[in-house]
């Protein structure tokens, strides 16, 4: 990928989700006409398109996205291409349930909504790497590509064992030892001092959730 973005125009556009309308090509055709009429010159594609790009594991369908890239380019527009990890496909949750998010009550979520995944899951990370690699290889040098949109919003904390271990690892790097952590969080209050790193759990309505330092650190790492 050697192309650089030098468009001097004011970028005008927004998120566009043609993957939701693939059964209605007449709608997609009208969309392009409306964009030109409104002088839209930039669209973000693929934010929640993972299931349209990889409908089953390892089977990729890029034809529809090829057409959108070419159509946007033909009208003189730019594409901001999103990595689609904000909304994983159903098959991923079904085959690899560890990718589903665990809430602060320790309950494993089922598939649904968005940002409902475990960021720490090795399987989730590998599947994200695979789809992102495919997108980069296919569209990295397309003349319409202006920039990348990484995933989506920050949300969907997970409290599974993977995330709790990452939480403790992060705290060990920050505080070095339990004595420093106990002091920073003032864990002598109510007699809750830690004596082992395995005792350090993230805030939970079922346990500790009134320690301000703990809450602040959780917001900093955002597990």
Where are these regions (language model features)?
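Boundary/entry segment of secreted carbohydrate-active catalytic domains
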Residues: 3-24
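Aromatic- and acidic-residue-enriched carbohydrate-binding clefts of CAZyme catalytic domains
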Residues: 7, 11, 46, 56-58, ...
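Short, well-ordered coil/turn segments that N-cap beta-strands
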Residues: 8-12, 39-41, 73-79, 141-146
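Active-site-proximal loop/turn and secondary-structure-junction residues that shape catalytic pockets
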Residues: 18-20, 49, 85-87, 152-154
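Aromatic-lined substrate-binding rim segments of carbohydrate-active enzymes
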Residues: 29-37, 44-107
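An active-site-proximal structural segment forming one wall of the substrate-binding cleft
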Residues: 68-75, 112-150, 173-188
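Conserved small/polar residues in nucleotide/adenosyl-binding loops
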Residues: 221-223
């Amino acid at each position: 990928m050697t192309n650089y973005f030098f468009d001097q125009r004011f970028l005008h556009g927004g998120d566009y989700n043609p993957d939701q309308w693939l059964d209605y090509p007449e709608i997609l055709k009208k969309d392009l006409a409306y964009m030109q009429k409104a002088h839209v010159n930039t669209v973000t594609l693929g934010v929640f398109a993972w299931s349209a790009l990889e409908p089953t594991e390892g089977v990729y369908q890029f034809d529809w996205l090829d057409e959108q890239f070419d159509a946007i380019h033909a009208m003189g527009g730019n594409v901001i291409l999103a990595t689609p990890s904000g909304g994983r496909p159903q098959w991923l949750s079904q085959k690899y349930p560890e990718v589903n998010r665990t809430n602060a009550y320790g309950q494993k979520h089922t598939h649904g909504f968005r940002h409902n995944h475990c960021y720490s899951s090795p399987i989730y990370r590998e599947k994200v790497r695979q789809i992102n690699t495919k997108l980069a290889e296919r569209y990295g040098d397309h003349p319409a590509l202006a920039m990348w949109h990484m995933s989506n919003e920050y949300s969907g904390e997970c409290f599974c064992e993977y995330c709790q271990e990452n939480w403790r690892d992060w705290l060990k790097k920050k505080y070095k030892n339990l004595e420093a952590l106990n002091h920073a969080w003032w864990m002598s209050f109510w007699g809750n001092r830690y004596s082992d790193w395995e005792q350090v759990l993230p805030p939970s309505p079922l346990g500790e959730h009134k320690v301000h330092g703990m809450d602040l650190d959780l917001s900093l790492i955002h597990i």
